[in-house]
């Protein structure tokens, strides 16, 4: 190291360092940090704000409208870029920083890299307690930002300018490591942001972070091949790791070579297009009938880049007790799940090495894969044409709302539109390369089952944290990451819209057109289904006023007030017309659809373990508890 230095404030050094971070994947190099979202307040406006104003470099700066909302946009950007490009997020101290914590949980649960820069209290403590500072009798060192420790892959505090160097180097190692990718949080004391230091110039050299494709050992590959050859009906679960590895070609080649069917997690969906003959779609609690039948048949499950969440495993009841597992993952920790044979490696590289070892091998599925897929497509076609009537209508979610209640909803919402018909209509009428973004409620289930991606990397579901309010804000991030003319559709329920839609305004502010598909069934329909399916009555999940009337909300008018182009569509014909006109618009659009409750799709061959009350005065809850205990007898314990 030379003795040459450059005098900068801590914040200026931060911005200069971010400009010098690059990532190289398969010989292609690009900047790793494309920009920064910020909401200025005391704690960052005169520190990081000054540094960005004076010398932003190539960093694009976006003004967020809510800290959680802008952070979800940053998370979606990283997800859509397959974890190879990021945005940072800077906030003020106190509540501004606290608003990031939920989003940090979203990033951590989904293994997505984001750099969080929450401002902190004074390092000198001279003016304490400052505005928005918490006071604890037990410790002066505790601040709001301690809440980040549970939701960060890497957490650090900078209270002296020279601490920035080691903090940033460690943070970027974590964010650019496929095995540990996740949010890095660096809390910078607000007085330290403006404090100057003579930094060594070498700290600001161009740094290239290489995403090397880890190849498993010969032992791992040989044993994995032996286990596959010994199986008769293996199934591959395509997880998010397969998508981030860009393993599409290798998955197709191996499946064609061996006739192994493919099923998908939310994170893995659209790694390859649905039209591939052996792709049976989503698996688990929200899976297709075809995928869940294949998993039920499996004597070997090959999990590629999956965390095996309860929604993938149906709370560990989806598999036969004798089923064996091979787990291929860059994270050694993930490979240990379900007592699997562990293969630590990159999905794309591992599949390329494995294929030659399986030469001549064929599963015994035969024509069963095609039969399962045909049966499922027939079921999807039925769901596309469900029609309401006022006398004998049976919704997909049966035995919860009677005809009178459904008629009440039809009258109050002035609609007979079913949710499944509306969703499939959207799928059939948007451009094939359109990106669909969703996160929470009943819509992820419909998307996992019914949305058929025609182009890879166009299905964008945040289902690690399933955070309400991600949809619209995440759509902005996906749009920022998308090709110039690629349309992005936020699929959102009225519940999630109410939770957060702050970056709708940001999309209009910066000309980043998104299309918001708002499904209004006047309530938290997904959770209403859950409570009633487990013996409870409908209780505080419907949007009813103090007179027990179903609420009537004009969500389109809210978006219109922001400046969006809006439509109201309560029939298939009106929806198609709105979709076509929305394609011609240059600014953000919102299509409001009033849909009937209980008309979302129901599960197939699945079960979800939830905390049903063991003691109750209601017979229906007692029965639900007994059913839970019976299902647990078929579940793996770990």
Swiss-Prot record:
Its cofactor is Mg(2+); thiamine diphosphate. One of its GO terms (molecular function) is magnesium ion binding. Residues 442-523 are annotated as: Thiamine pyrophosphate binding. Pathway: Polyol metabolism; myo-inositol degradation into acetyl-CoA; acetyl-CoA from myo-inositol: step 3/7. Thiamine diphosphate binds at residue 67. SUPFAM superfamilies: DHS-like NAD/FAD-binding domain, Thiamin diphosphate-binding fold (THDP-binding). CDD domains: TPP_PYR_POX_like. One of its GO terms (biological process) is inositol catabolic process. It catalyses: 3D-3,5/4-trihydroxycyclohexane-1,2-dione + H2O = 5-deoxy-D-glucuronate + H(+). Keywords: Hydrolase, Magnesium, Metal-binding, NAD, Thiamine pyrophosphate. Binds 1 Mg(2+) ion per subunit. It comes from the Bacteria. Its EC number is 3.7.1.22. GO terms for cellular component: acetolactate synthase complex. Mg(2+) binds at residues 494, 521. Gene3D superfamilies: 3.40.50.970, TPP-binding domain (3.40.50.1220). Belongs to the TPP enzyme family. Involved in the cleavage of the C1-C2 bond of 3D-(3,5/4)-trihydroxycyclohexane-1,2-dione (THcHDO) to yield 5-deoxy-glucuronate (5DG). This is 3D-(3,5/4)-trihydroxycyclohexane-1,2-dione hydrolase. The lineage of its organism: Bacteria, Bacillati, Bacillota, Bacilli, Bacillales.
């Amino acid at each position: 190291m030379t003795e040459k230095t450059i005098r900068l404030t801590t914040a200026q050094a931060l911005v200069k360092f971010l400009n010098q971070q690059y990532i190289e994947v398969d010989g292609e190099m690009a900047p790793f940090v494309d920009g920064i979202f910020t909401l200025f307040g005391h704690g960052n406006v005169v520190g990081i704000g000054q540094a960005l104003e004076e010398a932003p470099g190539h960093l694009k700066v976006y003004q967020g409208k809510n800290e959680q909302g802008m952070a979800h946009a940053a998370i979606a950007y990283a997800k859509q870029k397959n974890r190879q490009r990021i945005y940072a997020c800077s906030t003020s101290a106190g509540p501004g920083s606290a608003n990031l914590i939920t989003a940090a949980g979203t990033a951590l649960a989904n293994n997505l890299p984001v750099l969080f820069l929450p401002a902190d209290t004074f390092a000198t403590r001279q003016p304490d307690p400052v505005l928005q500072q918490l006071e604890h009798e037990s410790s002066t060192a505790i601040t709001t930002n301690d809440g980040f420790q549970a939701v960060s892959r890497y957490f650090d505090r900078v209270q002296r300018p020279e601490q920035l160097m080691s903090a940033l180097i460690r943070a970027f190692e974590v964010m650019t490591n496929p095995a540990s990718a996740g949010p890095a949080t660096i809390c910078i004391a607000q007085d330290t942001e403006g404090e100057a230091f003579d930094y060594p110039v070498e700290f600001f050299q161009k740094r290239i972070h290489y995403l090397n494709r880890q190849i498993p050992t010969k032992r791992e590959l040989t044993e994995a091949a032996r286990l596959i050859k010994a199986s008769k009906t293996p199934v591959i679960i395509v997880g998010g790791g397969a998508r981030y590895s860009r393993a599409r070609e290798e998955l197709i080649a191996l499946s064609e070579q061996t006739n192994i069917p493919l099923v998908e997690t939310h994170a893995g969906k659209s790694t390859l297009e649905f039209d591939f003959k052996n792709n049976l779609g989503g698996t688990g609690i929200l899976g297709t009938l075809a995928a869940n039948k294949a998993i039920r048949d499996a004597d070997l499950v090959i999990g590629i880049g999956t965390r095996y969440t309860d929604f993938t495993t149906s709370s560990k009841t989806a598999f036969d007790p004798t089923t064996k597992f091979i787990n291929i993952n860059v994270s050694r920790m993930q490979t240990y799940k379900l007592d699997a044979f562990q293969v630590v490696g990159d999905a794309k590289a591992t599949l390329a090495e494995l294929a030659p070892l399986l030469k001549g091998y064929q599963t015994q599925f035969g024509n069963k894969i095609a039969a399962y897929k045909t049966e499922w497509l027939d079921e999807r076609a039925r769901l596309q044409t469900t029609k309401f009537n006022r006398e004998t209508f049976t919704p997909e979610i049966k035995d919860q709302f009677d005809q009178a209640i459904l008629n009440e909803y039809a009258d109050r919402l002035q609609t007979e539109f079913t949710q499944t018909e509306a969703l499939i209509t959207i799928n059939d009428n948007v451009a094939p390369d359109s990106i669909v973004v969703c996160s929470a409620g009943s819509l992820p289930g419909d998307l996992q089952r019914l949305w058929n991606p025609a182009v890879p990397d166009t299905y964008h579901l945040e289902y690690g944290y399933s955070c309400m309010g991600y949809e619209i804000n995440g759509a902005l991030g996906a749009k920022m990451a998308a090709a110039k003319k690629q349309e992005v559709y936020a699929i959102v329920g009225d519940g999630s819209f109410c939770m957060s839609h702050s970056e709708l305004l940001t999309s209009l502010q910066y000309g980043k057109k998104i299309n918001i598909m708002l499904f209004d069934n006047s309530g938290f329909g997904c959770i209403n289904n859950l409570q009633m399916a487990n013996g409870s009555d409908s209780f505080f999940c419907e949007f009813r006023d103090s007179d027990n009337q179903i609420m009537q909300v004009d969500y389109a008018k809210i978006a219109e007030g922001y400046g969006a182009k809006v439509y109201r569509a309560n029939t298939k014909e009106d929806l198609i017309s709105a979709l076509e006109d929305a394609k011609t618009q240059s600014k953000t659009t919102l299509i409001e659809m009033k849909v009937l409750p209980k008309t979302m799709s129901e599960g197939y061959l699945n079960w979800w373990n939830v905390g049903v009350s063991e003691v109750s005065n209601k017979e229906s809850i007692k029965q639900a508890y007994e059913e839970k205990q019976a299902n647990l007898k078929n579940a793996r314990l770990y």
